[in-house]
Amino acid sequence: THRELVEGVEAGKVDFAILPIENSIVGEVRDSIDLINKRNIYIVGEVKHKIEHNLLGIKGSKIDDIKRVYSHEQALMQCSEFLGKYPEWEKIRMNNTALSAKYIGDTGNKENACIANMETRKMYNLELLQPDVNNEKENFTRFFIVSNKNLICENSEKISVITSTKNEAGALMKLLKVFSDYGLNMVNLKSRPKTNKPWEYYFYIDFEGNLEEEKVEKALEEIREKSIYLQILGNYKVYNVEI
């Protein structure tokens, strides 16, 4: 699970982990954002992956056999138009698409299918029932590479922070104005509810820059003054490649 990955990195059991953070169709992967909040881990890179979903079953099965479809929640949402053609199918959430493929392979039940990629088809010797069941063909997911070491290279170009403001009129607006004042391009802003504090939120922000830049240093100083909490998650390079 994502939690196990993050906890493994934080404890030093693994050097790096890759977490999905946002999909181009259905938006943010909320549990990933919540998991990296207030943890001793850092974002050290970002990569983009083109998503191709396929309906897979066990060898010898046909679409007419299917009664249940297993996959990750995001994959089920990204294939909702195809799945909507089969309202009688039970849609069952799994921790990830690879686990769903392994599960149906282990059960050997022709009534079970999964949504996963072609690699899992080969890995678990599954039948391709329907290729490319995505709602949209141009379907991409951004992934963060995380580590318990704050690794920053000279050409790091993006910064991610989590912050929280006082619950008073204009507090968030004043904080966001800092980005404009220093000419920093904010490329992402998300609000997430605070644990055990109803109707209170923290904010996840991505912006372009390098921590060595003077304007970035000054902007973060002002943001810290205007917030009640600020965590710099990382300053990293974006790898515009498909993995």
Language model features with spans:
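Domain-level signature for soluble enzymes in the chorismate/prephenate branch of the shikimate pathway
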Residues: 1-243
